[in-house]
Amino acid sequence: MIKKMMFVMVSGLVLMFTSCGNQHKAQSLVKDFLDENLVDQDCSYERFSRLTPTAMISFGQMKAMRQNVSKLPYVKKNIDYNDAAYPDTLLYLRATYKLTNHQGEKQEVTQTFYLDKGLTRVIGFK
């Protein structure tokens, strides 16, 4: 437990010093992921939170998140998360965006996205 806490703290410091580049990369990754996996791709991004590390999400919790998300009407079914080994530490950020449906109705959505440490893939979101 102490090792995990130390790792998270050290990761936080490292991220603080490299956050600008990683923040932009994470936002781009989330945007690309949503562009590929939203049913209606008319999406405008409002804001993103800071990229933050966490070691508190187990693979079982992630599987449950994925199942819940697959029930949302604006998300495509059977998303390919390009599963590899589940990382010990994830990075997450919250994204707020607006969706516009075919009738022109807007819906604001805020979701948390979990990314791998290398910022190469979205592991899941809720």
Predicted feature locations:
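Sec-dependent bacterial lipoprotein signal peptides
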Residues: M1-C20
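Cystatin/cathelin-like cysteine-protease inhibitor module
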Residues: C20-K126
